[in-house]
């Protein structure tokens, strides 16, 4: 029953969403946004790191999923987004969490069935999928959508891994099988 932390990075607002996966069932654990008021970028990055670290400490996730960088029209915005992503990833790595990245289009496709869905469509579907009584804030809904996408990826990868190795039973074995399936092209090396 892995706990998944999804992050929607931003240099002003970083959304987060935490779910627990129990087979095909998803349980909502929490969500919100790290709001950053600092004007200088180094202070904003420090705030993101502290916020993500606090969330990790509070919820003790097993996995960390984050949106990949997309090509923005404004190079300065893309650089700031990349720095915010990197800061959140460092917080996860410092807590020994495996990091998984997903393209925004794949996240939208997974949650709504439409790769070009807008934020409100994602928010509506996340609310329905997790059976929430109220809609989460938009950035939190995006983060939850990233976590949901990772949960679906786990489910698919475990089916494939178990077909190849029926003896997989423990949570650690499942995570290692998932990572080996995802990174089998040699981009990353796994210990153990």
From Swiss-Prot:
What Gene3D superfamilies does UniProt report for this protein, alphabetically? Ribonuclease H-like superfamily/Ribonuclease H (3.30.420.10)
Q: Which residues bind Mg(2+) 2?
A: 67
The protein's annotated catalytic reaction(s) are: Endonucleolytic cleavage at a junction such as a reciprocal single-stranded crossover between two homologous DNA duplexes (Holliday junction)
Give GO BP annotations, semicolon-separated. Answer: DNA recombination; DNA repair
| Any one of the GO CC terms | Holliday junction resolvase complex
Q: How is the cofactor bound?
A: Binds 2 Mg(2+) ion per subunit.
Query: Transferase: present as a keyword of the record?
Result: no
Name the active site residues.
Answer: 8, 67, 139
On assembly, the entry states: Homodimer which binds Holliday junction (HJ) DNA. The HJ becomes 2-fold symmetrical on binding to RuvC with unstacked arms; it has a different conformation from HJ DNA in complex with RuvA. In the full resolvosome a probable DNA-RuvA(4)-RuvB(12)-RuvC(2) complex forms which resolves the HJ.
Similarity comment text for this entry = Belongs to the RuvC family.
Give the protein's recorded name.
Crossover junction endodeoxyribonuclease RuvC
- Which species? Haemophilus ducreyi (strain 35000HP / ATCC 700724)
- Its gene name is ruvC
